[in-house]
């Protein structure tokens, strides 16, 4: 085999091995991230470890209005799974953002699941836009969430 071909094959194998250790990002979270940035003008990463409910999981009593937005969003995703038999984190939909007004619109997505999930994300993103962001509630002690 040609040495150049071997080099390319080795590079592909190494890149695949490296990629296998990176967990795939749920596709819908990209849509939700865009909505959050539209309504808050903040990075969606600002909300990944906020309070008791923003980010993965959630328990206890929400620490403030923004954290309540996240709990409502979690509950909405639960309803999507239960009543619409869909996987919200994997459901792709179409929406538009007006960066001038901070408004988000869900487009006709063709299925009840897509429409429901888009509305879950839209409602949460608008709630994030209205709620104050308190830096003291970033990376809080998990004991506060019991």
Swiss-Prot record:
Residues 1-21 form the signal peptide. Keywords: Calcium, Disulfide bond, Glycoprotein, Hydrolase, Lipid degradation, Lipid metabolism, Metal-binding, Secreted, Signal, Toxin. Glycans are attached at residue 109. Its cofactor is Ca(2+). It is an enzyme of class 3 (hydrolase). Expressed by the venom gland. The keyword Glycoprotein applies. This is Basic phospholipase A2. It comes from Micrurus corallinus. The lineage of its organism: Eukaryota, Metazoa, Chordata, Craniata, Vertebrata.
């Amino acid at each position: 085999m040609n040495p150049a071909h071997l080099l390319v094959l080795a590079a592909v194998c190494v890149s695949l091995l490296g990629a296998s250790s990176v967990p795939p990002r749920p596709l819908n979270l990209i849509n939700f991230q865009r909505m959050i940035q539209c309504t808050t003008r903040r990075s969606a990463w600002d909300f990944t470890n906020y309070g008791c409910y923003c980010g993965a999981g959630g328990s206890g009593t929400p620490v403030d209005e923004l954290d309540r937005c996240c709990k409502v969003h979690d509950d909405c995703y639960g309803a999507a799974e239960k009543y619409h038999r869909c996987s919200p984190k994997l459901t792709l939909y179409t929406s538009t953002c007006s960066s001038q007004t901070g408004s988000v619109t869900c487009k006709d997505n063709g299925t009840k699941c897509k429409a429901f999930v888009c509305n879950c994300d839209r409602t949460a993103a608008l709630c994030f836009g209205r709620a104050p962001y308190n830096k003291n509630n970033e990376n809080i002690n998990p004991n506060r969430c019991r």
